A protein has these predicted regions:
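Extracytoplasmic/secretory soluble proteins
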Residues: 1-185
Length: 185
């Protein structure tokens, strides 16, 4: 299991009185992020924080948008009429990415995250400048180990948000394929 998800610096939900595991939709997450932005948190060096970031080249911003996703293994769908559709050609895909634009526009998502290097991203997470991050939990932990953040500021340990539900409201789970799968080669 890769442990993809959204993570928040541990002192944030405590200061705001929010249980991060109660966040189940992207809309609830955005509300949580806005409250964190309004609070005015600082990093370990006393600098202003950015609300949310990703790792290199925007990896994995789509974790913030999980509640727009259907529970399935592929980007293709078979509609009621028997037509195959591709997610990136759907209205949902457009709406989902408009949320990303709104996050950047509202100052919730670091606009540099789409072109950043992994080292720069690790620095933002490692010194607690980013209040929220997403990708694999191990990557988040590694960034804080490199900086010593947890040793000097254990209250800033990143913790899980959610997990966010699928678009139909069902809980996010590890999706398993049915029947045969794999390569014939």
């Amino acid at each position: 299991m890769w442990n993809y998800g959204v993570f928040v610096r541990g002192d944030v939900p405590e200061a705001l009185g929010i249980d991060p595991t109660s966040i189940k939709t992207t809309e609830e997450l955005l509300d949580f992020m806005q409250k964190a932005k309004d609070y005015g948190f600082k990093d370990v060096n006393g600098n202003d924080c950015i609300v949310a970031t990703t790792f290199h080249n925007g990896w994995s911003y789509d974790n913030y948008l999980q509640s727009y996703n259907e529970k399935k293994l592929t980007g293709y769908s078979l509609d009621a009429d028997g037509n195959v559709t591709y997610d990136k050609l759907s209205e949902n895909y457009v709406n989902k990415n408009l949320v990303v634009w709104k996050m950047v526009h509202d100052g919730l998502l670091d606009k540099e995250c789409f072109t950043t290097t992994d080292d720069a991203a690790k620095e933002k997470v490692g010194n607690g400048t980013a209040l929220f991050t997403c990708a694999q939990y191990g990557v988040t932990i590694d960034a804080t180990k490199q900086s010593g953040l947890y040793d000097s500021n254990p209250e800033m340990r990143y913790t899980w948000v959610g997990p966010l539900n699928y678009s139909d409201g069902s809980a996010q789970v590890q999706v398993e394929s049915e029947g045969r799968s794999g390569s014939p080669a």
